[in-house]
Amino acid sequence: MDTLLLLKAAIMGVVEGLTEFLPISSTGHLILAGSLLGFDDAKAKVFDIAIQTGAIFAVILVYWQRIRATLVALPTERQARRFALNVLIGFLPAVLLGLLLGKAIKAHLFTPVVVASTFILGGFVILWAERRQQAAVRIHAVDDMTPLDALKVGLVQCLAMVPGTSRSGATIIGGMLLGLSRKAATDYSFFLAIPTLIGAGVYSLYKERALLSAADIPLFAVGLVFSFISAWLCVRWLLRYISSHSFVPFAWYRIAFGLVVLVTAWSGLVTWAE
């Protein structure tokens, strides 16, 4: 396989890993990177879905102690069952809405104006959430969440179906607006990512299975490995970062990136559509 193509796969894997769990929309960055690299044909979109697997494995590894302890304790401990139930409740709204409206949303909302608007609006929402965070925290740990809290965050996660929103951005910032601390919202967002990304990935790959080929295994493997490594580093860094910093820098980054979307769309440099 072409070495240059493998290098592009590695770069795309790094982009996926670094942006999947930050509140800045991995999809927007993958579209931009793919366009600049000339890695944006139909098979590239399947590749983008597949390399999410690496990012998912990274989160599982970071939280493995908690995940393992929960699985072991499920038959005997009420707290473990409540935690698992909260993740399930948060996961279900996106499943239902995705099956009902996923195709329509992609067909009608994937435009430069929508993508740019959601990037910019999301930035201002982060600024607002951070201002409220100082006085509105009522939940300091994931274990303190109720099923109703989980449902509310799950409903907010549905907003991530609008292109440019960011799944992690919707769940983290939505959680903060609903009263979760910055750490609790981030932890729950990561736990919620595991079933959400696995479910979306399996469903999307099944739909696009005709584009899959054994000859592409090296390409996908390179992207997955680099996605895993960069996501693992990014998640660990973010968990340390939020202990003493806010999400305000990400807000300004989103606003700037939204302007980049508009400029690249109007200039014809990038096709912001799927």
Swiss-Prot record:
Instruction: Share an example GO biological-process annotation for this protein.
Output: peptidoglycan biosynthetic process
* Top-level class of the enzyme under EC nomenclature: hydrolase
Q: Does the keyword Membrane apply?
A: yes
Pfam families in the record: BacA
- Which InterPro entries is this protein grouped with? UppP
Q: What is its EC number?
A: 3.6.1.27
Naming one, the record's GO cellular component terms include: plasma membrane
Similarity section: Belongs to the UppP family.
What is this protein identified as?
Undecaprenyl-diphosphatase
Question: Its encoding gene is what?
Answer: uppP
